[in-house]
Design a protein with these regions (language model features):
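Helix-to-loop junction immediately C-terminal to a conserved catalytic motif
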Residues: 20
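Conserved ABC ATPase "signature" region
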Residues: 68, 72-75, 82-100
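Catalytic Walker B motif of ABC-type/P-loop ATPase nucleotide-binding domains
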Residues: 129-132
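Helical segment within the ABC ATPase nucleotide-binding domain
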Residues: 144-157
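ABC ATPase "signature
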Residues: 189-190
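Short, charged/small-residue-rich alpha-helical element at the C-terminal edge
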Residues: 194-268
Length: 268
């Protein structure tokens, strides 16, 4: 599972829409499952599933009926290796919706509706599933249930998943690999552990002195602050220590491997 992590406006949705084939690239080459999107056929599209941030409601449909109907469009793309579509009853069980099979969609709760969205996204047994901000607006319980569902798809059924999120905890919990985006560019790439190691110890100390603002990156923020007060005393104001974290890297729009600008104030 791969997570595209970044703040609002970083380019996550634009990136995933290009990969899904919903938006044209402005330049370069984009391949998904070995196919240039400009040459993507219906056979290729049957190998890809998507769960969007928003949907057009099918409130009058019953859950099982809608899955069976949508699944029927994939039957002609069945192969010896991949039997399409997913059986509606089996899919309901996978998505945790069996007891709601005969409900009208408008009667589902928000969490149940998002489970149905995922079921719709995988009804054709895609090799690759795109999830765009899938847990936006979820309460903690619904978020945990959704995480369990996504984990099951990846681990039990071998579905490759690419999701976008601005939630670092979600990215760390779900993804084996994280790409951090900012301003439409990838500024970091690796596992959560690898990214954390790259910035380990690089705290950022901010302060003002005589009306001037200063910033210092250091691996020993406590000692640095002590020496700062030792040298300048009460003239130091607005002291702030920002501990190193991936969240800070995303918010600051910096590369996890780049060094922060160094404005040294302490005399050597």
């Amino acid at each position: 599972m791969l997570a595209l992590l970044g703040p609002n406006g970083a380019g996550k949705t634009t990136t995933i829409e290009i990969l899904e084939g919903f938006r044209m690239r402005s330049a370069g080459r984009v391949e998904v499952l070995g196919v240039d999107l400009a040459d993507g056929t219906e056979q290729w599209r049957a190998r890809v599933g998507s769960v969007l941030q928003s949907w057009r409601d099918h409130g009058k449909w019953r859950v099982r009926e809608l899955l069976a109907h949508l699944g029927s469009y994939y039957a002609c793309y069945c192969t010896e290796l991949v039997k399409r579509p997913w059986d509606a009853n089996e899919l309901l069980a996978v998505a945790g919706l069996t007891e709601h099979a005969d409900k009208k969609i408008k009667m589902l709760s928000g969490g149940q509706r998002h489970r149905l969205d995922v079921a719709i996204g995988i009804v054709g047994r895609p090799e690759l599933l795109f999830l765009d901000e899938p847990t936006a607006g979820f309460d903690p319980a619904a978020r945990r249930e959704f995480h369990d569902l996504v984990h099951g798809l990846a681990e039990q059924y071998g579905t490759t998943i690419l999701l976008t999120t601005h939630d670092l905890n979600e990215a760390e919990k779900l993804a084996g690999r994280i790409l951090i985006l900012n301003g439409g560019r990838v500024i970091a790439d690796g596992t959560a552990e690898e990214l954390a190691q790259r910035i380990a110890g690089e705290d950022e100390v901010r302060w003002t002195r005589d009306g001037q603002h200063f910033v210092q990156s250091t691996t020993e923020s406590t000692r640095f602050a002590f020496e700062l007060f030792k040298q300048y005393g009460e003239s130091i104001a607005d002291l702030e220590v920002r501990r190193s974290s991936l969240v800070h890297q995303v918010e600051a729009g910096q590369s996890a491997t780049a060094e922060a600008n160094d404005y040294e104030e302490v005399a050597r």
